[in-house]
From Swiss-Prot:
<keyword id="KW-0479">Metal-binding</keyword>
<dbReference type="GO" id="GO:0046872">
    <property type="term" value="F:metal ion binding"/>
</dbReference>
<keyword id="KW-0001">2Fe-2S</keyword>
<protein>
    <recommendedName>
        <fullName>Quinoline 2-oxidoreductase gamma chain</fullName>
        <ecNumber>1.3.99.17</ecNumber>
    </recommendedName>
</protein>
<keyword id="KW-0411">Iron-sulfur</keyword>
<comment type="subunit">
    <text>Heterohexamer of two alpha chains, two beta chains, and two gamma chains.</text>
</comment>
<keyword id="KW-0560">Oxidoreductase</keyword>
<dbReference type="GO" id="GO:0051537">
    <property type="term" value="F:2 iron, 2 sulfur cluster binding"/>
</dbReference>
<dbReference type="GO" id="GO:0018523">
    <property type="term" value="F:quinoline 2-oxidoreductase activity"/>
</dbReference>
<comment type="function">
    <text>Converts (3-methyl-)-quinoline to (3-methyl-)2-oxo-1,2-dihydroquinoline.</text>
</comment>
<comment type="pathway">
    <text>Xenobiotic degradation; quinoline degradation.</text>
</comment>
<keyword id="KW-0408">Iron</keyword>
């Protein structure tokens, strides 16, 4: 997931 960088939860 690219958005993983913006989602610390992931």
């Amino acid at each position: 997931m690219i958005q993983a960088e913006k989602n610390p939860x992931l």
